[in-house]
Amino acid sequence: MRTIAVLTSGGDAPGMNAAIRAVVRTGLEKGLKVMGIQRGYNGLINGEIFEMDTHSVSDIIQRGGTILRTARCEEFRTEQGREKAAKILKAFGIDGLVVIGGDGSFHGAQLLSKLGINTVGLPGTIDNDLAYTDYTIGFDTSINTVLDAINKLRDTSTSHERVSVVEVMGRNCGDIALYTGVAGGAESIIIPEKEYNADKLCKQILQGKLKGKMHNLVLLAEGVGGANELAKYIEEVTGIETRSTILGHIQRGGSPTCMDRILASRMAYKAVELLISGKSSRVVGIKNGEIIDMDIDEALAVERSFDQELYDIATILSK
């Protein structure tokens, strides 16, 4: 192993820069040449590859986003596109590739490994939707961003004695809504993993008002969607003024938290070690506080277990 490269793919997540920094500095310390690939698989196919040194990653650990940029790539979805990518990696003398991203990015790494490229994946996604790992890079920062937002929304909702419906990210995984719902004291949490009934929700809101609640906070994962429609329905049924807020891409930005910086650094260090040891088609994660690695195929096949206990706690504490 003489030369490794790193790319970021899919949606950006706070902590990606910390991971890039750790890959570069660990690789250099181990005597490797480290290359950066811009704009994910799209940049790989277009040959947007450059050599990195310690100065390339100076003063980036505190920055959100990714200095390598990220982009979608339709061409990489084709066999010809992947073969072109593999040839370019070999032409640059790259022996190993670290891919930072979500499940789609991992599928790409998996396919490249079948073309003879040593690959290791790092989980970089705010959704926390990769089942093989307890946490993904970016999740902690995202939930703290959301928590700050709902704290402010609670202030104005209380002042006006209204219902606030807040839509957060999470298509198939409701962890952002669940975690921030518990931490933010939400009265209702609506996530893809659990069915909900709008009429039952309205009844709960009315019961809360009878108990003296001055406001009501409803957290809604985008996988369920329809925050504007739900807010309108709640107001029609209950007669209580209701406002909707869709937080959107603000959840992906911002300086990463201490946890995300440390998690990214530990995972990236492990990724370089795996490549040096000759391992390929692996992903890195964290389980019970320990950094782990496993086969990409096995990782992608792991079924996600829903945290029923946390959901039950949220239900009890919201009453």
UniProtKB/Swiss-Prot annotation:
EC number: 2.7.1.11
Pfam families: PFK
Gene3D superfamilies: 3.40.50.450, Phosphofructokinase domain (3.40.50.460)
A GO CC annotation given for this chain: 6-phosphofructokinase complex
Pathway: Carbohydrate degradation; glycolysis; D-glyceraldehyde 3-phosphate and glycerone phosphate from D-glucose: step 3/4
Entry keyword set: Allosteric enzyme, ATP-binding, Cytoplasm, Glycolysis, Kinase, Magnesium, Metal-binding, Nucleotide-binding, Transferase
Binding site for Mg(2+): 103
GO biological process: canonical glycolysis; fructose 1,6-bisphosphate metabolic process; fructose 6-phosphate metabolic process
Residues holding ATP: 11, 72-73, 102-105
Annotated positions binding ADP: 21-25, 154, 185-187, 211, 213-215
Compartments in which it is found: Cytoplasm
Main location: cytoplasm
One function term, GO molecular function aspect: ATP binding
Protein family membership: Belongs to the phosphofructokinase type A (PFKA) family. ATP-dependent PFK group I subfamily. Prokaryotic clade 'B1' sub-subfamily.
Protein name, as recorded: ATP-dependent 6-phosphofructokinase
Classification lineage: Bacteria, Bacillati, Bacillota, Clostridia, Eubacteriales
